[in-house]
């Protein structure tokens, strides 16, 4: 299934990359690879991740042993990556 990133998700990726480059440059490539792999898995099996309790149209997939979560929505013909957040942060509310 086709994957599209919202502007918010693209900003999240840039923020994550910048922060990791400043604080943990050795880890940054591994996190980037893990994000790409998880997005590819979501594209293959879009319904496998759990739904967000108060937003059943949105799903959330954890990034394994890295503290990030990918929030996404499944549409008829595509998957929209809405946000990518550090698990300790309160996610923004995605717009409809």
Task: Name these PLM-found stretches.
Residues 2-60, 75-78, 94-96:
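Basic, Lys/Arg-enriched alpha-helical interface segments
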């Amino acid at each position: 299934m086709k994957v599209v990133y919202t502007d918010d998700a693209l900003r999240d990726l840039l923020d994550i990359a910048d922060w990791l480059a400043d604080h943990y440059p050795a880890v940054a490539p591994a996190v980037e690879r893990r994000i790409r792999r998880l997005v590819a898995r979501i594209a293959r099996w879009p319904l496998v991740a759990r739904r967000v309790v108060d937003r059943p149209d949105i799903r959330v997939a954890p990034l394994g042993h890295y503290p990030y979560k990918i929030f996404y929505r499944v549409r008829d013909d595509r998957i929209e990556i809405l946000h990518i957040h550090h698990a300790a942060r309160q996610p923004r509310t995605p717009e409809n």
